Amino acid sequence: ALTSANTSGKKIVVLSHSFASPTFKKLFGDFKTKYPTAELVTYDAIPYTANLDAAQEVFGHRALPVYDLSKSKLVISFQADFLGDFNAQSLETSYAAARMPGENMMEHIQVESNMSLTGANADTRIPLKPSAVNKLLIEVYNGLNGGTSDKTATDLVNKLQAQGSNAVVLADGSKAAIVLSHLINQKLNSSAFTGKANLLKEYDGARYQEFLSWMNG
């Protein structure tokens, strides 16, 4: 069946969850050498599409940045439930280290539309509609890059500038929001970025849609 499909030019699709294994990639490479019409398509139950697309746009590669909050003095989260399943990484351990009572205890501000585990632990929780959360994030970005007339954004910008590299902004929900958070953290030179990347998630929404078009073609 494989030889027949290959000879007739039909796609031979290997559908797999993210499998960041060099051995697996080599085996598929050998398989594709034998059957040139073979295609590898990745599908994950939790795809992290927006996170991966944002990383591709800002950093140039589809890999999730790894954070460490242990030495941060301020975290501002926009819809990011980072004590839950955020960015394919749990930040509970480094968050707990940063929240040890004392003069260096990290301040946590949560901007979100629905109560989350992370929001329940925040020093300050700012409840807003989803569209307003995104607007505030944009205003914070603007405030760090010229100015904003939004009072809440100005207050957050002042806090971020006061902490500088000891601050970090986390966002979730859309590619645009996550891109802005990355750009803000670059502006701050945030030390919460470890320089490491999580390569365990490889889902590509455009690639999966292409696979569906093959099925329907």
What are the language-model segments listed below?
Residues 1-217:
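Cofactor-pocket helix-loop regions in the catalytic cores of large enzyme subunits
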